[in-house]
Amino acid sequence: PTGLCTGSSGLLLTAVVCGDAIGWESGGREHIARQCTNGVIAAATHARDTNLDDINVDAINGLASQLRAYAEIAEYLPEVRPNLRELARVTRRVTRKWLRNYPESPDDAGYAHSTAGVLDAYLAASHLCGATVDTVLVEQQVQAILAAIHATGNVSQGWCHGMAGFGFLAAHLCDHIDTRAAGESLLSAIRPGLLAPVDHLGLSV
C-alpha cells in the first residue's frame, strides 16, 4: 500500500515531521529524502501508465492521498519538489477525468472516497503545477455535492462522508478567488450542521 492513511506515503510523512521536530540521525534525512523522491516518481508513473478504471483515486489511500502526503513532505524536504510537479500534473489529469466521468448525483459525495476528496486533489494538483483550474467543472461538482447533501437530508458531522470533509474542501475552495464563490455556497449549505453542538463529532464517519 502506498496511500496516506495505511501506506508508505503516510509513514514517510510521519518520519519527515518527526525527524524535523526531534532531529535526524546521521544520514537519516538523506535516506528518507531518497525514499520520498522514489515514492513520488512511482506514484506519478503508476497513475500515468494505468487505466482510469484501475486507479484508486480517493483521499484515504489513493492518488489524491499520495499527492497530499508528498506535497506536505515537500514543505520539509525541498529536494522532493521537482518530481512533485510531475505527480501534480498527472494527478490533475486523472482527477479531472474521474470527475468528468463520475455520476452527476452520487449517493456518497464525501471526502474520503468520493467527489469532495477528488475535487480537492484536483484543486491542489492544479495549483502545484501552475495549471488553470476548470471553474465550470468545479461549479458542477460543488452543485453535485450540494444535491447529494440535500437528497440525504441527514448528513453526519464526520470527516469521511460528512460535514467536516465538506468543510475541508470548502475552505480550500475559498483560498482562491476563482473558486471562492463555489466554496462560499458549500459553506453556506453545511454551516448549520457543521457548527451544531454535539457530544461526539465522529470524525472518521
Task: Tell me what each language-model feature is.
Residues D54-A121, H127:
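Solenoidal tandem-repeat scaffolds enriched in leucines and small polar residues
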Residues P1-I41:
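Well-ordered mid-protein domain cores that form the structural environment of catalytic cofactors
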Residues L4-G10, A59-G62, A112-G117, C160-G165, ...:
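Glycine-centered tight-turn and secondary-structure capping sites
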Residues L11-E25, Q66-E79, G117-A131, G165-R180:
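Well-ordered alpha-helical scaffold segments within catalytic/enzyme domains
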Residues P1, E30-L52, R85-S105, T132-G153, ...:
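Long, well-ordered core segments of solenoidal/helical folds
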